[in-house]
């Protein structure tokens, strides 16, 4: 779940009904508590208005998702893949009595200073950390597109999209 939607109650409720691992990214200001709160919420049962298999409205009841983790994506201010940051993220989860303190590190976004070419630097550092400590994290994320850059999707201008370039 992305940095901007980690605070969304709807996303937290939907995740609570999934029986698979789901990651919540720290927000773009670097706050771990928001992702921790999202994990806490998704761990619990929820009841909300949804749509049934026939397309009608219904009340959906979930049992909670115990397989959530935090994704460190950096922030608009700094990176957060270093040892101190990973420790702080895990402490945020531990201090809130979460039984799992799983962290995945995103090599892109704020951790690459929004330059895809820096992902290899982040990955090299993480390889060293994982070699020293197998519990450093549960994995890494890399961002890859066929062509570099990003583009906006503008209503009615789908034909102007460039192939293989991220739509943001």
Segment roles from a protein language model:
Residues 1-88, 109-110, 114-125, 129-131, ...:
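Active-site-facing alpha/beta catalytic cores
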Residues 60-62, 94-98:
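Acidic (Asp/Glu)-rich catalytic clusters
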Residues 91-95, 163-167:
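Catalytic-site microenvironment of enzymes
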Residues 96-98, 132-135:
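Short helix-capping segments at alpha-helix termini
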Residues 105:
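Conserved, mostly hydrophobic/aromatic
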């Amino acid at each position: 779940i992305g940095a901007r939607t980690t605070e969304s109650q709807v996303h937290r409720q939907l995740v609570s009904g999934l029986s698979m691992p789901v990651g919540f990214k720290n927000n773009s200001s670097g706050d771990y508590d928001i992702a921790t709160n999202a994990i806490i919420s998704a761990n619990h049962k929820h009841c909300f208005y949804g749509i049934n298999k026939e397309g009608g409205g219904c009340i959906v009841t979930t049992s909670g998702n115990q397989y959530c983790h935090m994704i460190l994506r950096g922030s608009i201010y700094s990176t957060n893949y270093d040892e101190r940051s990973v420790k702080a993220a895990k402490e945020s989860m531990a201090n809130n009595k979460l039984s799992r303190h799983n962290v995945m590190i995103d090599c892109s976004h704020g951790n690459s200073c929004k330059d895809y070419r820096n992902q290899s630097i982040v990955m090299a550092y993480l390889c060293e950390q994982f070699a020293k400590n197998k519990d450093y994290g549960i994995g890494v994320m890399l961002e890859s597109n066929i062509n570099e850059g990003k583009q906006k999707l503008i209503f009615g201008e789908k034909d102007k999209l460039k192939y293989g370039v991220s739509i943001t």
